[in-house]
């Protein structure tokens, strides 16, 4: 495998960050975050401690679901200007139920290199530690927070034969367990893994 100098000008990096243990940040991710020109963070306050510990020098910008429309053109302009851009989420891989998906698609369309710096992912960490079948699985991300769309999605998931992984906010977890339809006769709940 050929290795290139990183960060490369005009390249977008999707960088996996720890989901509970700072030791999970790879040496490659650490070096890249120290060197990129721009770091787009889901929450600059949350990521600030990690980036300060790394002595990351890049300009930090917030990049989340509420400002994607305005930040996307700014980040694309940075790439067009030849700057290296890293995207990080609060925990795990950006683009997996976190910001990054739309930016990666736009960067591909504009023919900018898009490089994933692998790291922890809560979905796969929970799956492999659950003891449930993991050879084939379905990932649902976050469910709608309420209403008919949420009920409809739960009914669709109930028909799924593969192990299903979904995300839920901690304050809604007990409600989710109460909402699971009676048709979940095959439901197996692993021990909930703290992250």
Q: Where are these predicted regions, by residue range?
A:
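Glycine-rich, flexible N-terminal cofactor/catalytic loop recognition
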Residues: 1-65
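Short glycine-rich anion-binding loops that position phosphate/pyrophosphate groups of nucleotides
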Residues: 19-20, 90-94, 170-172
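Short active-site oxyanion
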Residues: 33-39, 112-115, 163-164
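Glycine/small-residue-rich loop that forms an oxyanion/phosphate-binding "nest" at active or ligand-binding sites
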Residues: 75-114, 121
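Class I SAM-dependent methyltransferase SAM-binding "motif I" and its flanking Rossmann-like core
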Residues: 102-160
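Conserved anion/nucleotide-ligand pocket segment
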Residues: 159-183
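Conserved small/polar residues in nucleotide/adenosyl-binding loops
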Residues: 185-191
